[in-house]
Amino acid sequence: MTQVTVKELAKVVDTPVERLLQQMREAGLSHDNAEQVVTDSEKQALLAHLKSSHGDKVEEPRKITLQRKTTSTLRVAGSKTISVEVRKKKTFVKRSPEELEAEKQRELEAQRAEAEAERLKAEEEAKRKAEEEAKRQAAAATSEAPAPAASPAPLSEPVVAAPVVEVERKKEEVRRPEKARSDEDERRDRKHAQHRPTLKEKAPAPRVAPRSVDEESDGFRRGGRGKAKMKKRNQHGFQAPAGPVVRDVAIGETITVADLAQQMSIKAAEVIKFMFKMGTPVTINQVLDQETAQLVAEEFGHKVKLVSDNALEEQLAESLKFEGEAMSRAPVVTVMGHVDHGKTSLLDYIRRAKVASGEAGGITQHIGAYHVETDRGMVTFLDTPGHAAFTAMRARGAKATDIVILVVAADDGVMPQTQEAVQHAKAAGVPIVVAVNKMDKPEANPDNIKNGLAALDVIPEEWGGDAPFVPVSAKAGTGIDELLEAVLLQAEVLELKATPTAPGRGVVVESRLDKGRGPVATVLVQDGTLRQGDMVLVGVNYGRVRAMLDENGKPIKEAGPSIPVEILGLDGTPDAGDEMMVVADEKKAREVALFRQGKFREVKLARAHAGKLENIFESMGQEEKKTLNIVLKADVRGSLEALQGSLSTLGNDEVQVRVVGGGVGGITESDANLALASNAVLFGFNVRADAGARKIVESEGLDMRYYNVIYDIIEDVKKALTGMLGSDVRENILGTAEVRDVFRSPKFGAVAGCMVIEGTVYRNRPIRVLREDVVIFEGELESLRRFKDDVAEVRNGMECGIGVKSYNDVKVGDKIEVFEKVQVARSL
């Protein structure tokens, strides 16, 4: 037996010694010193005292649950047996004295309430019997009185009420007295009540209430055992509105007929019928403009709420936070000018690279974006094409730029694309720095350039204007430093600012479809910082930036303001000029992209339908145009747009070009099938066909051509259209003879003696006989003689005799005109 002292016990139970001694004294132990020994029995006594003082008692189990499991076998068809296991569980609860006392009180209250209810019921029954007795006596007195012959006997209340009373009386006799229900009955009723649908509590009514004839006819019927039952009426009813329902109809910039009808809660046929009455035939999927839809909705009596179609985009713009300190950024400079004036060569010298030699035909066909570190700071350059077909590219270049370098060749002067570049720069409000190139040539004439540009309102600084003119030579490298100095001086004047800490924003310069990497977009970051992994929204496309490359193809992690980069990860190739912005989450980007796609589709459908309606009467009675169908594939989006724009301008009233399919990337099997189905020519601009496409082209004999210079495509298409035009029949007047006398011949009839006054008269050629310059006969020259000899031709100033086949009414003074018909090839 282990013995411990009071001190050791206090240490074990983590209690002060004085407190433990006090508790031991309260337990009836005689310990008063910390060194005294405590036995096990004394410990048990102390523990029992502490438990009783704290209220802990050894509780007996209050709930016992019994489970029973029985297994049986069920035989089914096909001599199969199924084992069925039935489990039952029963729980017995031992209630405390307090609960038993409360239960007794509830039973007593229930008995008192039941006795009170019985008393009220007895009083009500006695009262009812007294009323019935009074009614019976009144009915008997009425029946004994003499009734008029015309009035029929009453058959409602006495006839119906008396038998019912008898039946109820018999029921009362047989009905046993109600006993107080046991706990088991109440529990069972509560269990059933959980599974029964809740019914409305009916108001207390007298047991035998007389029914009227209306009640009998309206849903009441007699049951088989004399019980009154009510028919269930589960019929659904619709109550028409008291007045017309006025709805709020939200109308955007465009809305289809079906959507408008749905918002007004009417059938689309009613809207179409109304539009027909207004004189506008429409279909269910036709797009209406905002004014027309507003007029229709107001005519139907609804309230119109005009909403902006750009609400979703405005919310997106508001959600983006562009906070941070604005800092100076590098200028974006666009090099513009006429073709072959040396734009790319000038940029090459600045970049110390040879780009122009790599361009097909020596002309730029894409917008190139580069940033260059100079001694005076960083400058971003955009190189635009100068050919007329690249008008849209130059316009985009001017839109994204801060300063324009206008390159003009000193030996060539101001050309059409030079004028166009000036117009784009002025429309964008961008300052112009003129670089007079090719100053190393002996025929250079810079004064001619100044005069030509002054006529376009580009006044040199030395003439009091604001456009610096810098003579340069891209070949020799002279004047390049002065040109960069002039550009950076203009940039300082503009005070260009950007916020590097904000989310990235920019513009798409170019896009293409790379076979290994998917859609690739060249983006110029204009504000903020674009980072790898950002979710970007670009026009109708979106995606997460998987990788970013600089202009040399090296991967980078982020790009600040004025930096051009190539981004990978978009779901499609965006159009050049589309705005790029970094958004917070993919869901918002997808919503806006899908909204823009739907909006673009609706506008396109509306434009196409309007064009059809406008041209429907113009095309009536005209022959169908001959169409040259083309499937066009290009390497980048900008070149594709330039080609489509150039080809669409070719043609006239008889022939036209239709680009049935276009895209970025190589020629695929689906492109070849499209060309086969539409009888089109396949053109590839800087792209090639894959094996599947080549197989279809060879087997079906399709016309497929590759090009790398835009001039060649345009020239070939012009030739093809010229061949489709056919040829014109033109009449050439060979000679004219004047009739001086008329002779009679037994063989030819009337023979005209003539003098050739113009050209040469030939035999067996068609002729016209003119009298007072009016054609009176057209036929063939049958006989031509000079001095009684048949000749083949008679020249100017000679006399001859002319016999006209099947015509004898020749008179003196008539003119005989000899002509020929020639087929001449037509041109556009």
UniProtKB/Swiss-Prot annotation:
It is found in: Cytoplasm. It holds the Pfam family EF-G_D2. Residues 222-235 have a biased composition (Basic residues). Residues 473-475 are annotated as: G5. It comes from the Bacteria. Residues 383-386 are annotated as: G3. Residues 362-366 are annotated as: G2. GTP binds at residues 337-344, 383-387, 437-440. Residues 95-136, 166-188, 212-221 have a biased composition (Basic and acidic residues). Gene3D superfamilies: P-loop containing nucleotide triphosphate hydrolases (3.40.50.300), Putative DNA-binding domain, N-terminal subdomain of bacterial translation initiation factor IF2 (3.30.56.50), Translation factors (2.40.30.10), Translation initiation factor IF- 2, domain 3 (3.40.50.10050). GO terms for cellular component: cytosol. Residues 93-240 are annotated as: Disordered. Residues 328-501 form the tr-type G domain. One of its GO terms (molecular function) is GTPase activity. Residues 137-165 have a biased composition (Low complexity). NCBIfam families: IF-2 (TIGR00487), small_GTP (TIGR00231). Belongs to the TRAFAC class translation factor GTPase superfamily. Classic translation factor GTPase family. IF-2 subfamily. One of the essential components for the initiation of protein synthesis. Protects formylmethionyl-tRNA from spontaneous hydrolysis and promotes its binding to the 30S ribosomal subunits. Also involved in the hydrolysis of GTP during the formation of the 70S ribosomal complex. This is Translation initiation factor IF-2. It comes from Ectopseudomonas mendocina (strain ymp) (Pseudomonas mendocina).
